[in-house]
């Protein structure tokens, strides 16, 4: 079920690119892994979108997307520092948001599940974000990430990039999704802009949205 708006945009974007998509693919470490910890590993995690394009080859054939729809944006430099332990973590440790990238037993279970679903041992892993801040180039070169996703491509998808692609490729044929139809209506009404209109504002302190952002870290 596509509950998150960013996830719906990702879905439409990938379908525009010719991919078949599925959602909320669950994975977890195997119970006989030597580093298995029942208190941490017994409940499955899931990845938001898995996309498959039979007309492509190599890592482009399968795209796996984890959506981080944080209103304050995604600071790639800060998050990687938290994963590395060089920056203080929020209340919920950052590695829990990136188990498949950072924890070998989870990465193994993740890759096994993706291969079982798609038949492909390597793929493109993308983190979809509302807005990207910091240095994103360090992520695919990080030794831990490279070791945990060998042969895979790692990078980011921004909402701006996906939305611009959708607006550019939309025709007058009614779109199949609500997000696609909304994009068509906004485009038809002339309510789209080629550049960023306003910078994002953080949620008001003490609001539910602010609490969610703090917990997501």
Predicted regions and their residues:
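Intrinsically disordered, low-complexity Ser/Thr/Pro/Gly-rich regulatory segments
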Residues: 1-217
């Amino acid at each position: 079920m596509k509950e998150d708006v960013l996830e719906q945009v990702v879905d439409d974007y990938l379908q525009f690119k010719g991919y078949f998509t599925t959602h909320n693919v669950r994975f977890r470490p195997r119970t006989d892994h030597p580093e298995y910890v029942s208190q941490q590993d017994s409940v499955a995690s899931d990845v938001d979108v898995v996309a498959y394009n039979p007309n492509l080859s190599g890592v482009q054939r399968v795209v796996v997307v984890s959506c981080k729809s944080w209103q304050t944006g995604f600071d790639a430099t800060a998050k990687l520092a938290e994963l590395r332990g060089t920056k203080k973590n929020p209340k919920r440790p950052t590695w829990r948001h990136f188990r498949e990238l950072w924890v070998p037993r989870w990465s193994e279970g993740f890759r096994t599940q993706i291969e079982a679903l798609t038949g492909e041992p390597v793929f493109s892993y993308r983190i979809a974000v509302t807005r990207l801040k910091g240095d994103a180039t360090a992520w695919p070169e990080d030794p831990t990430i490279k070791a945990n996703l060998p042969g895979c491509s790692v990078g980011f998808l921004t909402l701006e990039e996906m939305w611009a692609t959708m607006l550019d490729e939309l025709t007058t044929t009614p779109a199949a999704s609500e997000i696609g139809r909304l994009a068509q209506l906004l485009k038809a009404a002339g309510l789209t802009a080629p550049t960023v209109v306003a910078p994002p504002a953080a949620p008001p302190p003490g609001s539910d949205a602010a609490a969610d952002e703090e917990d997501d870290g």
